[in-house]
Amino acid sequence: MAGEHLGVAISASFSGILRRVSTVYGTALLVQGAETLLSDRAVDARVKAARRENPQAELIKLEGREVDAGRFVEATGGSLFSQATIVVVNAVSDLDKDLFDLVTTTAANPPDTLCLILVHPGGTKGKGLLTRLSKAKVETVKVDAPKPWAIPDFIAKEARRGHLDMDHDAVNALHQALGNDLRTLAAAVDQLASDSPNGRVGAQAVTTYFG
């Protein structure tokens, strides 16, 4: 009987651990890099995960240049109207350096009801905050722009993402026509996918659209 109780207790404890690991609440994410499409997608993915977990969560978006200590504490300290809060702080590079310790402390140990997302646009501005967040081992997603030679791979992945069959020549034709801007390329792939009833496109079609 004692063994049975012990087994139940262990099972319950393990389930609790799994729930804590899988939740995005009580966590912070730093999205760092200059590629805005990838940055937006990383933020959107975390917000969607938080919303799936708690559809009633309040979403608060802040701009680094407008944040002071009082506003940050108010946003991250919990809501009177919701049991959970998603806080996105854009351009943390613009935060006053006097806030670096406060932001780092919160990111290192967020309340269980908070999903915190910090967005840094790359570059050296706000480096002191990045150093602190790194030392605090805050989860980080790097969203740097791919090298030009890696752009065809990005296009191919976008095509698969949109269930579009693009051969090698079509991928290269799109790259040559539109260059290296990821947002432009992603929009072009979306257009090709929506205008291709058979889900397949070749180099000639790409040239017709964008050549």
Where do the protein language model's features map onto the residues?
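Conserved beta/loop motifs at nucleotide-recognition and modification sites
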Residues: 2-211
